[in-house]
Amino acid sequence: MHLILLFSLLLFFVLMFILYGPGVYNDSDQYIKMHIHREPLYPLFLKLLRDFFGESFLYPMGIIQNVFMAIAIYLLTRTIGDRFKLPVSMEALVACIQVFPHIMTKYFSAMSVFVTNSVMSEALAFPLFTLWTMNALKLLWKGEKKHIAGTLIFSLLLSLTRGQMMVTILVFMLIMLCRVISEPQGRRKLLRILGVVAVTAALFIIRTYAVKCYNLVYNGRFINNTYGNVNLVTNMIYASDREDGEAIREEQTREFFYEIFDKAWEIEGNYSFSGDSLMDRADHIEQMHDEIKFNCIEDTFYQYYDKNVTTDYITQNLLADEQAMGMMKAIFPKCFKNWLVTYCGIVYYGLVRSIAVVHPLINIAAVGSYLLAIVLTVLLWKRNPKSPAVPMMCLALLFIAGNTTAVALTIMCLSRYMIYGFALFYLSGLMVVTELIREWHCAKINKTCTRKEE
């Protein structure tokens, strides 16, 4: 039966690729050309395929990505099935829940993308995240060294695929700290805590140097990815008033700010043009973010650099990040209140998109789902503190919170950035409900149910 499940998953994903073919989108060219803005792992994956298959590399790419996704879903399904002793029918439901986000982004999102068909880093990040989830759950349930190593490795790979996935490194740190702190008191507890922090710091350092080495080889500069500060300053400019520019001391940076602000104002790219509610603010910034970034900030910087400084693209990116940092330091204290409202609006939509689609009625249901999940998890914890569903739900909520708050700092919380937590949340909810039913059933027949500790 398990082979039938694996075959069904492989058949579904391969058929979706045959039906729709490879998806090339606005960002795809940057991955193919190993752009300075992009993390290294996915461009290297594409380069390897180009070296083997030439210009027809998109077709083996699609097959590999879809097969990888199918296998990852199968492995996570078997892990959950074994831990909760699920029948095959329940394992099939677990697999279907993991497939649904792919259907949702294809048929219910504005971009209409089947993720694992696309030339986007999400196509590699999604199966990697599924395998990270499998290892993180095993780490929570068993805590063996091989699961620590597995979670670490997949955290590093994910962070080298998408910058937002650095949050998995922090989640790993929190898992390990919780395990260490919950252990009996001992002399080595402090050393273990320091060890966890040191390993986490080392992982970030390794990630940074890996990116710099990649850029040295393929872009000729030993530097980190550029454009991060430009992303950060975009929402600050949206949340600012023109007089905030008076706080900028450096003359050229101040002139840049005024020019960018005026361009944004002309296209109504300012909080003043949004509605009063949090949803209105979120809707408006989602419409204006790219307009401000590309047509106001980027256009202003690069036109000036072309005429007065250099036409070298990487140097222009470094200068743009430097100017953006200068703006942020000066205007952030001035625009903090408006920025925070905007940020909360983006986070709100991100939390909704992590488990649903944005719609006035569905938004309320999504918030209710979070509250219900918390209440049911607490009830289960009170009945059976050792239930594996409790840490599973905690992992889901922790990742969703971390992913949403991290992405909202730099850009909009679009569905393709948020869907990683979708399956984990509903799988956790399903397991919490399953465990509660078992507990209530056992209590009803006055028997004690125990599960052998693995």
Give the residues covered by each predicted segment.
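Extracytoplasmic catalytic/substrate-binding loops of multi-pass membrane glycan-assembly enzymes
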Residues: 17-56, 320, 340
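Juxtamembrane segments of multi-pass membrane glycosylation machinery
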Residues: 44-67, 81-88, 108-113, 352-360
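Membrane-interface anchor segments at the N-terminal boundary of transmembrane helices
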Residues: 59-68, 309-401
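Transmembrane-helix motifs of polytopic, lipid-linked glycan transferases
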Residues: 63-90, 127-135
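Transmembrane-embedded, aromatic-rich helix segments that form part
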Residues: 150, 164-182
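Membrane-proximal stem/loop segments at transmembrane-domain junctions that anchor or position
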Residues: 224-342
